[in-house]
Amino acid sequence: MGAATVDILSNGRLILGLGTSSMPIVEDFHGDKFSNPVQRMKEYVEIIRLALSKKQINYSGKVFQLNNFTLLIEPKRKSIPIYLAAINEKMVNLTWEIADGVIFYLRPLEEMKKTITKMQSKKRIDVTCQIITCVSEDSENAILRAKKTLAFYISVGNIYREFLSKNGFQNETKNIFGEFKKSGFKSNHELVTEKMLNSLCIAGNPNESKQQLQKFRDSGIDLPIIQFNPIENTKESFSLLKKTFLEN
């Protein structure tokens, strides 16, 4: 109902992004059981599409059961585009099977290019990727901020750490996480290598950042999603970000 409402308010412009999250967040933060993420996502999508059709739903899945459910409001559209967040192979395969688009995050450029080429040859969907982005007139400040953000996700996000370890950055992830366990976030960003930074982030002055964005586009991404990371003054930093990417 929330998605249908936002689609009405936005005059049919909503794209619904869905993700199953990870075991630590679901179980430790929310107190729920994390199980069967691929099957759970498959049923999410089936149920949402049935609900938007305004038909009465009687659904019996392996995860969810619904009896006599009908959406109470009249949706703007009978079909809202659904994009799925995907990291590992099973979720990537499901996404290309049932979704309108995919949302990638912290995926090395070369690996992402190979995955997009392989999957798009089977069926074309929209490809998006959220990219850690730090823009400053001082390139070194931008790079430092990006390294700290990347080190944070590697330290606390086991699913990203494991994926990156299997895809070209085994030593880096091991070292960054090891230092995090010893001293927290004090200095583990210093272990982010130039290769890792260039493969996963946009960081630099405005001209450098625009060039780096093009690398991600060239990998097959249709819609880069800029993850804003402010440097010093947030308002000024956001103004520079807009000037960099939105103004010719």
Where are these regions (language model features)?
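Active-site-adjacent structural elements that line small-molecule/cofactor binding pockets in enzymes
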Residues: M1-N248
